[in-house]
C-alpha cells in the first residue's frame, strides 16, 4: 500500500468516523494554504484531503482496507482528491474553517415583518390614572387578493428554470488545489428557487398592501413621557405572508397649565398676600382629584413648600401615588393709600420694627423699611 491514510490523519485503523472527521478538521485548520503558504504544507494539505476522501466514505474505506485503490473507482482524478469524485468533501473543508457547512437550498420568501412606531399624546390626568385610546395606524397587511402569495388569482409561483428550484447556481474553477466548486444566489429568482410569472395586480407581487386600521391601546397609570408600549404582532406584515412585527406606541405627555411633573410628584405655585402669609389662610386648589383647600399656616414664608401626600402620579410599578408639592409665593403691595400706610406704620411701631430717625443701626431693617425698599425696587 503506497500511502497509509490512517497515519496521514494520525488516527488508529479502528478509529470511528467521528474521530476521523475531527482529525481532518484539526489538520485542515493547520495546513490550509490560506493559513500556511509553505509549498510543503500545501502538499501535506493535499494528502490529508485525499486520506479523508477515502476514510470518510465507507465503500472507499472498505476497498482501501482490503488493499485496493479506492480513488481509481471515483471516475476521475484531480490533484489532492479535488477531482470529479472529490466534491463531496468541499463542505467539510468549509466546515473546518467556518464551523458549519455551506448552506444549501433556496431561501424562503416568508420573513418576519418590520416593527412600527406611532406617537400618542395624552393629558396629565390620563398619565396619572391610566386611560384607553383609539389610534389610527397604517401598516402593511396580507393582500387578500392573492393571500400573500404574490401571484395573480388562478396562477402560482413556478420553479425557476435557471437554478431548477435550488436557489443557487454553481460553477467550477481550477486552482492549484485542483477543481473547486463555488455557488452564488440565482440571479433570476434572487435565491428563492421560484419565480412569479404573473404578479398579483393588487399588490404587484409583493403579497402585501398598505391598510389603515383602528386599534385600542390600554395606557397604564403612571406612564412617563417617552414611554413605549409594545403591541406584539401589530406591526408590518412580513413578505410572503410572514409574521407581523410589533407596534410600539410612544407616549407624549402634554404640558399642564397648573402642574409640572417631576417623576411621580407634581409641583405648583400659589400666590398669597403678605397679610395672609402672616395671619394664615386656606387657599382653594383644583387638584387631579378635585377641589381641595391648602392650609397656609400663620407665618408662612415666601418659597416655603407644602406637601399634599398621595395627590401626585400613580406609581407605574407598585401601589400608591406621588405627592403634590405646593410652593408658596408671598406678594407685597406696590401701592397703598394713606390709611393703609398709616396702619402699616402703626403695626411696625407696635412690633418695634419702625426705624427711629437718627438711630440707624447698620444691618438692621424693620418690617416697614423692608416693604418700602421692595416697593421702590431696591
UniProtKB/Swiss-Prot annotation:
GO terms for molecular function: ATP binding; heat shock protein binding; unfolded protein binding; zinc ion binding. Zn(2+) 1 binds at residues 143, 146, 200, 203. It is found in: Cytoplasm. GO terms for biological process: chaperone cofactor-dependent protein refolding; DNA replication; protein refolding; response to heat. Zn(2+) 2 binds at residues 160, 163, 186, 189. Residues 358-367 have a biased composition (Polar residues). Its cofactor is Zn(2+). Keywords: Chaperone, Cytoplasm, DNA replication, Metal-binding, Repeat, Stress response, Zinc, Zinc-finger. InterPro entries: DnaJ, DnaJ_C, DnaJ_domain, DnaJ_domain_CS, HSP40/DnaJ_pept-bd, HSP_DnaJ_Cys-rich_dom, HSP_DnaJ_Cys-rich_dom_sf, J_dom_sf. Residues 4-68 form the J domain. Residues 351-378 are annotated as: Disordered. Its main location: cytoplasm. The keyword Metal-binding applies. One of its GO terms (cellular component) is cytoplasm. Binds 2 Zn(2+) ions per monomer. Coiled coil: none annotated. CXXCXGXG motif repeats lie at residues 143-150, 160-167, 186-193, 200-207. A zinc finger (CR-type) spans 130-212. NCBIfam families: DnaJ_bact, PRK10767.1, PRK14278.1. Homodimer. Belongs to the DnaJ family. PANTHER family: CHAPERONE PROTEIN DNAJ, DNAJ HOMOLOG 1, MITOCHONDRIAL-RELATED. Participates actively in the response to hyperosmotic and heat shock by preventing the aggregation of stress-denatured proteins and by disaggregating proteins, also in an autonomous, DnaK-independent fashion. Unfolded proteins bind initially to DnaJ; upon interaction with the DnaJ-bound protein, DnaK hydrolyzes its bound ATP, resulting in the formation of a stable complex. GrpE releases ADP from DnaK; ATP binding to DnaK triggers the release of the substrate protein, thus completing the reaction cycle. HAMAP family: DnaJ (MF_01152). This is Chaperone protein DnaJ 2. It comes from Streptomyces avermitilis (strain ATCC 31267 / DSM 46492 / JCM 5070 / NBRC 14893 / NCIMB 12804 / NRRL 8165 / MA-4680).
Amino acid at each position: 500500500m503506497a500511502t497509509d491514510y490512517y497515519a496521514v490523519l494520525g488516527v488508529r485503523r479502528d478509529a470511528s468516523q467521528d474521530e476521523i472527521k475531527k482529525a481532518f478538521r484539526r489538520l485542515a485548520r493547520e495546513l490550509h494554504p490560506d493559513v500556511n503558504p509553505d509549498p510543503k504544507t500545501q502538499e501535506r494539505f493535499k494528502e490529508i484531503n485525499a486520506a479523508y476522501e477515502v476514510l470518510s466514505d465507507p465503500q472507499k474505506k472498505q476497498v482501501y482496507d482490503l488493499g485496493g485503490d479506492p480513488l481509481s473507482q471515483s471516475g476521475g482524478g484531480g490533484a489532492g482528491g479535488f477531482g470529479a469524485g472529490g466534491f463531496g468533501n468541499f463542505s467539510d473543508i468549509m466546515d473546518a474553517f467556518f464551523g458549519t457547512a455551506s448552506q444549501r437550498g433556496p431561501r424562503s420568501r416568508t420573513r418576519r415583518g418590520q416593527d412600527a412606531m406611532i406617537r400618542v399624546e395624552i393629558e396629565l390626568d390620563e398619565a396619572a390614572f391610566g386611560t384607553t385610546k383609539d389610534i389610527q395606524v397604517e401598516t402593511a397587511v396580507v393582500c387578500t387578493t392573492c393571500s400573500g402569495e404574490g401571484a395573480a388569482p388562478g396562477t402560482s409561483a413556478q420553479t425557476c428554470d435557471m437554478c431548477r428550484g435550488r436557489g443557487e447556481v454553481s460553477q467550477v474553477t481550477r486552482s492549484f488545489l485542483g477543481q473547486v466548486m463555488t455557488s452564488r444566489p440565482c440571479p433570476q429568482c434572487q435565491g428563492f428557487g421560484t419565480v412569479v410569472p404573473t404578479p398579483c395586480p393588487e399588490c404587484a407581487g409583493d403579497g402585501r398592501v398598505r391598510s389603515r386600521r383602528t386599534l385600542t391601546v390600554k395606557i397604564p397609570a403612571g406612564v412617563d413621557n417617552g414611554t413605549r408600549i409594545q403591541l406584539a404582532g401589530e406591526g408590518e406584515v412580513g413578505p410572503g405572508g410572514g409574521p407581523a412585527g410589533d407596534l410600539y406606541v410612544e407616549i407624549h405627555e402634554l404640558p399642564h397649565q397648573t402642574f409640572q411633573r417631576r417623576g411621580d410628584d407634581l409641583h405648583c405655585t400659589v400666590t398669597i398676600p403678605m397679610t395672609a402669609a402672616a395671619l394664615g389662610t386656606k387657599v382653594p386648589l383644583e387638584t387631579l382629584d378635585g377641589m381641595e383647600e391648602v392650609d397656609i399656616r400663620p407665618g408662612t414664608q415666601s418659597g416655603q413648600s407644602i406637601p399634599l401626600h398621595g395627590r401626585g402620579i400613580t406609581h407605574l410599578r407598585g401601589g400608591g401615588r406621588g405627592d403634590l408639592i405646593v410652593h408658596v409665593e408671598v406678594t407685597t403691595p406696590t401701592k397703598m393709600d394713606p390709611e393703609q400706610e398709616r396702619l402699616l406704620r402703626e403695626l411696625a411701631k407696635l412690633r418695634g420694627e419702625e426705624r427711629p430717625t437718627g438711630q440707624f443701626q447698620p444691618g438692621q431693617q424693620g418690617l416697614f423699611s423692608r416693604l418700602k425698599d421692595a416697593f421702590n425696587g431696591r
